[in-house]
Amino acid sequence: IIIQAGGKGTRLEGLTRNKPKCLVPVNNLPIIFYAFQKFKDANFTIIADYKTDVLEKYLRAFGSQYKFNIIKASKKGTISGIKEAISTYKDDEPFMIMWCDLILSEDFEIPQNSGNYIGISKDFECRWSYVDGKFIKTPSKENGVAGLFIFENKQALKNIDEEGALAIEM
């Protein structure tokens, strides 16, 4: 599981002054730990950029029971770190990408059917939408991109850019 945790969390203002957004607590638990607990046995690749040193120290101290490695993207934008993370996967290996601030419901399950999936929001507004097989930077409550992507292999992302925002067609 790849967790995109590189943003500054600017909309959280003072909460991220001394820590990355993924360590902001929700009900006394850092957001990233919801993913750790949901997928206890998974191997996590965490893409970090802001306050990486704080994240590393915190996870080594309080997350040692989970299997993770932290990478810092060498180029700009969301896609740079994702591209670097998937380069370590086998060509036919399925994987999931999720944003660090996504807390999945207890009954969420990964689909068992093969294929690629995009998490779509039906009840809260997202900054990006998924319309006609494309990402568009238009807020939506009905077709908002919720920050969860499941791929059966690396093929769907083979032509992505080296830097910038995640923009794939499915």
Regions found by a protein language model. Name each.
Residues 14-15, 86-87, 110, 140-141:
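Short secondary-structure boundary/capping segments
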Residues 58, 159, 169:
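Residues that form generic nucleotide/phosphate-binding pockets
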Residues 3, 11, 25, 29-99, ...:
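Conserved N-terminal catalytic core of the sugar/cofactor nucleotidyltransferase
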Residues 7, 50, 154-155:
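Alpha-helix/helix-capping structural signal
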